[in-house]
């Protein structure tokens, strides 16, 4: 995505909606400028970063301060016209140089702490997700060079109060906000315009001659397809939470094979007949897992443990410990059955496949051998 595409508004019902940037971009920019100020020993009031999506952001710096080998800077979060709980708050970084050669990243005041398994971060760590961790560390390394070390602390004085308006506590992230953002950019869209934009991508793929499509919830699915399946991501289309809508659109456009690829946290819902996977529509992840574990003869102890989990990742640890990993093949087959039930009045329904993978990019299960599916997709 270019600077021009970032500046270009998103149009909805004739209204131009402004894009914004994530807490991850704010933290990255704040850390970069703080590191630069320590090195140069003068205040800087504007900083540029390149987001993971390739957008260059030029951001204003607030509250810059230098004291010896330490500097502090803040970036104000701007969600564009997609206003959320963190919009308008300051995200600070404190950078202290040292001779260790290592960069250490921590979360301070207002940054949540991970207290439960299942969010992809170690227990007790700061709620700074993987992509922002990488961009923060890379930006600081670029600023200080290969030999120096630095302690980087991200903090947000308003974080604890703002977090009350988020789902963090339900996920076991306590005491503040999360530093998040896979692309670094916030794109505001209503649901209908968002769905239409996704459908347009399907239309473009079909117009190029593709007969097989891979539908993924988000960026992680595309990475899995590329790295673990060895399939050209030209066939990948993001479906977000709109599973049913995108399947129907794929059928309308004449695709002959639909492959659903994603983490169980999203795809499990399809096994229960839930075709809009946003949590405000329906959840039932644990109930679905418990029901299908019971069908496979799982002991009551495992069913109880899974039923009490707050996240799919946490439930997966219990499932693995009890030796019920074969449930993922079972669920993948059930997902395909649900899709075919939805399409039961379609004259010539497409082939449907489903593949489930873990956060660390390993195959968990599929309705048939993944190699077989991948070979067909490469034709």
Curated annotation (Swiss-Prot):
Pfam families: CbiD
Cell membrane among keywords: no
SUPFAM superfamilies, alphabetized: CbiD-like
Pathway(s): Cofactor biosynthesis; adenosylcobalamin biosynthesis; cob(II)yrinate a,c-diamide from sirohydrochlorin (anaerobic route): step 6/10
Top EC class, one word: transferase
EC number, UniProt record: 2.1.1.195
GO MF, one annotated term: cobalt-precorrin-5B C1-methyltransferase activity
Presence of the UniProt keyword Ligase in the record: no
Keywords attached to this entry: Cobalamin biosynthesis, Methyltransferase, S-adenosyl-L-methionine, Transferase
Domain of life: Bacteria
InterPro entries linked: CbiD (IPR002748), CbiD_sf (IPR036074)
Catalyzed chemical reaction(s): Co-precorrin-5B + S-adenosyl-L-methionine = Co-precorrin-6A + S-adenosyl-L-homocysteine
GO terms of biological process kind: anaerobic cobalamin biosynthetic process; methylation
HAMAP family tied to this protein: CbiD
Stated family: Belongs to the CbiD family.
Name of protein: Cobalt-precorrin-5B C(1)-methyltransferase
Organism of derivation: Salmonella arizonae (strain ATCC BAA-731 / CDC346-86 / RSK2980)
